């Protein structure tokens, strides 16, 4: 029997509640006749670790993750620690250290969930947003000088490389090719950013020639936000820079009903390193410890993890269980207008996996 070694990093806030819920659901799936099992290793990194050690994770923290088949992550963020420390000290350290250059965020309106767009049906909103996850606006290049003085200066430099853009474009075109509509929208801002984004556009055109069966178009990022709201059915697969996709994918999750249901995968397509899967919601300290967190985003992230591991049948089974639960409005958590608890939603998914 195959054993998948999964690193679990709950992180901060409600991450400490939804990651154990994800483990419980994966164990229930494995126990329900699957031909594999899971071996979980938990890492207590995050804000509490920072308070004890002055860093979000150990300096050599990537090493115990390196031999794992995948990483299940919760959330990063602590109201008592600057955001740039919590993000760069943990999540981005893993993403960049393992060259997880493709961030993939599927968005659908799940059964039983009401999206805010009154003329948008579930069939109209079925997207995947591909985010360049290794460079661009989050390359980490920049600095500050003359801090505290009137002439203080600070820079954050967006860095794009030909190799980095080529590989994310090729990944996005290949993903679009695998979907029924074979449709890709390349998000840009080359009208105002006339160097790196122009190169981005040129490389998109170049890579498109490798995929003659994929229909593609180009959309300015500001216009894309309006298109997502006004013409959602015109979109299918999107590819955007690190910052642009970060913003667009949160809008996408909101249009699908809640950030609490949205998953993401930080993927190393070449499989040199473990990929990392996580819900996109934040640490939500306001509801931490109250049992109110929506675990659906974590469960859907587990579906993505199973697909990445090649367990497509098990992934489909878990997704059916998730959709059966969201279809029952008595099992909606507060972010969806209900009063169900994390435990109730988790137990309901586990019951459906066992039945």
Segments the model singles out, each with a brief description of its role:
Residues 47-49, 104, 227-330:
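Glycine-rich phosphate/nucleotide-binding loop
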Residues 12-15, 69, 130, 172, ...:
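Buried hydrophobic positions in well-ordered alpha/beta secondary-structure cores of metabolic enzymes
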Residues 22, 26, 204, 298-306, ...:
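Buried hydrophobic packing segments
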Residues 35-59, 228:
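N-terminal beta-loop-helix "entrance" segment that forms/cooperates
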Residues 7-24, 29, 33, 149-221:
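Glycine-rich phosphate/diphosphate-binding loop of Rossmann-like nucleotide-binding domains
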Residues 50-155, 243:
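N-terminal glycine-rich phosphate/adenylate-binding segment common to multiple enzyme folds
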Residues 140-186, 190-194, 312, 317, ...:
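Glycine-rich phosphate/pyrophosphate-binding loop and the adjoining helix
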Residues 112, 219-226:
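Short acidic loop-to-helix transition motifs that present clustered carboxylates
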